[in-house]
Every structure is written in structure tokens, then in C-alpha cells.
């Protein structure tokens, strides 16, 4: 009796160990059974509901699919946050990575990136950047111009501080091209060095006011002594 019973116990233990090994193998390969960050999870299909702030990424292999909860969606997918769930959605067919369904960040081979779109070729007036395959406008900035007069409240005179500005134009690299190029400008703080007509320097005005107050005090003293 003991021999068949021991054999039966060993067989049951072997079955349990085999099932445990399969579960560990599935979790290690990223297929079903990886329930990290899940609210609802199954060994066969993985996660179906994720914890808050995580994205549900569903990977399909043939007719089977496996869910996984991730902090960031993998390359070729972008995250969509919703009231019920956050999901990873696949980018467009020509996008390698994207910010949304309508805005690509990097295109697949043989496509060129222009204003978030992946195009077969760059539009007229643009050139392809060799490393990024981005379409860039053919503009070369000219040297900076001279600084403008220092202006405060629309005036070039006064006291205190104002702003001075300089500009440079970004013209087409080739004169025959008609790319739309922008004007660049920058401003910086500057001191107003010239007083407006009829205006006194605040420092001189303060000194004059102090002198007048001092003179009035001196005038009062003899009057006060005489009244005593």
C-alpha cells in the first residue's frame, strides 16, 4: 500500500512543479502571467485592467493577445488617457514614433518628416536633413543688425531703464528659392541716458528738495528764538 501511495504523491508533486515552471516561464518571456501593475489579470491573456496612471499595452501574436501595464508606451505607440482606462495606441503606418495619431516625431525609412507628417519626399522650398530625415526650410540667417535706441514707454528720453532691440533676417539660401523665412529679433535692458526737455534728474531733484527743507528749518530757528 505504501509504494503506490508514495508514487501517487510524487506524481502529484511533479504535476504541481511543472505547472509552476510554466507560469514562471510565461512571466519571464513577457507573455501571459506578467501581472505587474495590474488590477485584473489572467495567466493566459495577461492584464486587462491597469492601476491608475499606467497604460495598458496589448501585444498581439497571431490570434492571441497579451496585456501588459507600462509607465510609457513602447516605440511605435503613443499613450491615450481616458476616464475609464489609459491605453497604448499604434502610430500611423509611416511613423516610427509619434506624439499622437496625427503628429509624428520620427518617420520610417524612405519617408521624410515635415510638420508632424511623414511624406514620401520633402515639399518645394525645403531640404532633407541627412541624419534625421526632417524637411527644413532653406533659410540662412543674416548677421545681427545694430541695436536700436534705448526706448521706454515709446520715448528715447527720460530716466531709469528701457529696452533696445536688434533684428536679423533669415533669407533663402538660394535667391531663386521662394521658401518662407522669418525675421529674428532679440531685446535687452538698457539705461536711459538722456533726459526729456524740461525734466530734471531724480538725484538732482532729491538733492534740491533736501536743500530746500534744510533752508526752511534754518529760517524757522531765529523766529522761534525771538518768540521766546
Curated annotation (Swiss-Prot):
Gene Ontology annotations for the cellular component aspect, listed alphabetically: extracellular region
Residue ranges, annotated region (Disordered): 193-228
Keyword flag Transmembrane helix: no
Database matches in InterPro entries: Furin_repeat, Growth_fac_rcpt_cys_sf, R-spondin, Rspo_Fu-CRD_dom, TSP1_rpt
FU repeats: 85-128
Signal peptide per UniProt: 1-19
Ranges of compositional bias, category Basic residues: 203-228
GO annotation terms (biological process): nail development; positive regulation of Wnt signaling pathway; Wnt signaling pathway
Keywords noted in UniProt: Disulfide bond, Glycoprotein, Heparin-binding, Secreted, Sensory transduction, Signal, Wnt signaling pathway
UniProt xrefs under Pfam families: Furin-like_2 (PF15913)
Glycan attachment sites: 34
Compartments where located: Secreted
Residue ranges annotated for the TSP type-1 domain, each copy included: 138-197
Disulfide bonds: 35-41, 38-47, 50-69, 73-88, 91-98, 95-104, 107-118, 122-135, 139-181, 150-157, 190-196
GO MF annotation terms: heparin binding
Assembly mode: Binds heparin. Interacts with LGR4, LGR5 and LGR6.
UniProt note: domains: The FU repeat is required for activation and stabilization of beta-catenin.
Entry's family note: Belongs to the R-spondin family.
PANTHER family: NEUROHYPOPHYSIAL HORMONES, N-TERMINAL DOMAIN CONTAINING PROTEIN, R-SPONDIN-4
Primary role: Activator of the canonical Wnt signaling pathway by acting as a ligand for LGR4-6 receptors. Upon binding to LGR4-6 (LGR4, LGR5 or LGR6), LGR4-6 associate with phosphorylated LRP6 and frizzled receptors that are activated by extracellular Wnt receptors, triggering the canonical Wnt signaling pathway to increase expression of target genes. Also regulates the canonical Wnt/beta-catenin-dependent pathway and non-canonical Wnt signaling by acting as an inhibitor of ZNRF3, an important regulator of the Wnt signaling pathway.
Record's protein name: R-spondin-4
UniProt organism field: Mus musculus
Amino acid at each position: 500500500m505504501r509504494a503506490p501511495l508514495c508514487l501517487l504523491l510524487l506524481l502529484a508533486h511533479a504535476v504541481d512543479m511543472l505547472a509552476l515552471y510554466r507560469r514562471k516561464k510565461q512571466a519571464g518571456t513577457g507573455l501571459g502571467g506578467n501581472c505587474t501593475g495590474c488590477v485584473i489579470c489572467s495567466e493566459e491573456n495577461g492584464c486587462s485592467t491597469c492601476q491608475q496612471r499606467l497604460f495598458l499595452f496589448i501585444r498581439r501574436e497571431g490570434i492571441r493577445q497579451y496585456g501588459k501595464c507600462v509607465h510609457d508606451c513602447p516605440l511605435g505607440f503613443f499613450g491615450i488617457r481616458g476616464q475609464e482606462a489609459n491605453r497604448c495606441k499604434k502610430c500611423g503606418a509611416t511613423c516610427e514614433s509619434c506624439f499622437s495619431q496625427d503628429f509624428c516625431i520620427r518617420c520610417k525609412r524612405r519617408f521624410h518628416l515635415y510638420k508632424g507628417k511623414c511624406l514620401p519626399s520633402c515639399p518645394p522650398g525645403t531640404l532633407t536633413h541627412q541624419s534625421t530625415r526632417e524637411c527644413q526650410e532653406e533659410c540662412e540667417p543674416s548677421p545681427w543688425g545694430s541695436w536700436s535706441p534705448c526706448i521706454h514707454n515709446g520715448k528715447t528720453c527720460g530716466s531709469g531703464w528701457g529696452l533696445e532691440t536688434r533684428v536679423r533676417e533669415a533669407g533663402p539660401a538660394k535667391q531663386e528659392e521662394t521658401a518662407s523665412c522669418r525675421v529674428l529679433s532679440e531685446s535687452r535692458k538698457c539705461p536711459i541716458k538722456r533726459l526729456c526737455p524740461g525734466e530734471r534728474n531724480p538725484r538732482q531733484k532729491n538733492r534740491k528738495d533736501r536743500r530746500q527743507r534744510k533752508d526752511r528749518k534754518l529760517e524757522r530757528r531765529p523766529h522761534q528764538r525771538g518768540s521766546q
